[in-house]
């Protein structure tokens, strides 16, 4: 494996940078594709990565980035035209004779899903499977620990975790464990060819248990507050700049939030895929949370307290984004009968006994065969 060069896309991001770092630690030659040079890319270069700057939507730049590599970790941009990027990489991989593609996808991916990004994740998975003579492995996590920990500043300052769970539980994985599964697949892609893995944490947690773990990491009591999805989405709008959530991200998030009450994150979880592929036990939520508590926004200062209190107040004032209107104005296509994952017979078939994650996948059934 040490003679095989691996390309990681979106290498400055949290998951891809972890993939790059872990590969370098194992002595694997890496090429880190970034959108621009900055402190993050400089760090990867200092660790020994070859850093290339490329636009993931430009086929010529993509082809140049792929040329000379043997394996690709495809981490898609969260963008309405993400499928264009996937096609560009598939074409480049085919022309360059890439040996393997390990692609980061979504546990919710379905051709019926109301989120454009999630439907395109499903199509991307099908696309890479079509590449002849190229091993393909899917890494499809659900709702990450990182998503919950974006609320750590409020938990630190106000002692509350306002989160809509609908009574559902989740076993959220760390970015590092997601990366470990991807690295395991990249090191031995032919062993994992045709498989889909869903990294999770070691235990299903309720909202209250997530709040308790945050509180232990912070050294203070944190109380989970069940709030409706619409209120959470207003809070996301208030904090959108800090979170890095543009309107397209918010349009998808509103659908993902509804899955918790339907038990979607509990289906098949927790998995053993981190242990099976990476050979280590998955990190528990408390361990993950402790890595986040040193940030400047979690420090107990008067300024941070007032900032979080003001954001909390703004949540009750600002109007909601009209996200359905946004989708229409952006001309985002919709399936004839959009369904959440838990409501989709296709999704249940692909994620149930006929298409179990971690074993060789069956080809997806035709949508016409699964009418709910």
Please state what every model-predicted region is.
Residues 1-43, 57-60, 67, 78-81, ...:
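Oxidoreductase cofactor-interface core, primarily capturing Rossmann-like NAD(P)-dependent enzymes
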Residues 175, 207, 229, 284-285:
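Structural motif detector for alpha-helix initiation sites
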């Amino acid at each position: 494996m040490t003679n095989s060069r691996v390309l990681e896309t979106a290498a400055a991001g949290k998951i891809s940078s972890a993939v790059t770092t872990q590969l370098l630690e194992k002595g694997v030659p890496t090429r880190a594709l970034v959108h621009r040079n900055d402190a993050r890319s400089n760090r990867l270069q200092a660790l020994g990565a070859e850093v290339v700057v490329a636009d993931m939507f430009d086929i010529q730049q993509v082809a140049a980035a792929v040329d000379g590599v043997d394996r690709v970790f495809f981490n898609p941009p969260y963008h309405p035209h993400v499928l264009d990027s996937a096609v560009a990489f598939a074409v480049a991989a085919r022309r360059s004779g890439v040996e393997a593609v390990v692609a980061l996808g979504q546990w919710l991916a379905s051709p019926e899903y109301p989120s454009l990004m999630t439907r395109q994740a499903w199509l991307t998975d099908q696309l890479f499977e079509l590449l002849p003579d190229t091993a393909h492995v899917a890494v499809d996590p659900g709702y990450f620990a990182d998503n919950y920990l974006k609320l750590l500043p409020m938990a630190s300052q106000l002692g509350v975790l306002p989160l809509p769970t609908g009574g559902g539980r989740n076993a959220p994985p760390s970015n590092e464990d997601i990366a470990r599964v991807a690295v395991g697949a990249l090191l031995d892609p032919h062993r994992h060819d045709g498989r889909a893995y869903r990294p999770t944490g070691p235990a299903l947690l309720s909202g209250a248990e997530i709040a308790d773990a945050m509180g232990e990491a912070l050294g203070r009591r944190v109380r989970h507050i069940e709030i409706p999805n619409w209120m959470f989405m207003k809070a996301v709008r208030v904090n959108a700049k800090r979170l890095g959530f543009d309107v397209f991200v918010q349009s998808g998030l509103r659908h993902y939030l509804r899955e918790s009450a339907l038990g979607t994150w509990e289906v098949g979880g927790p998995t053993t895929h981190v242990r099976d592929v990476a050979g280590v036990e998955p990190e528990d939520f408390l361990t993950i949370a402790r890595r986040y508590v040193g940030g400047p926004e979690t420090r107990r200062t008067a300024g941070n307290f007032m900032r979080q209190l003001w954001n909390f107040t703004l949540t009750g004032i600002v109007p909601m984004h009209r996200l359905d209107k946004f989708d229409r104005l952006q001309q985002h296509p919709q399936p004839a009968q959009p369904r959440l994952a838990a409501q989709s017979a296709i999704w249940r078939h692909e994620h149930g006994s006929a298409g179990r994650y971690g074993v060789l996948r069956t080809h997806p059934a035709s949508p016409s065969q699964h009418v709910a």
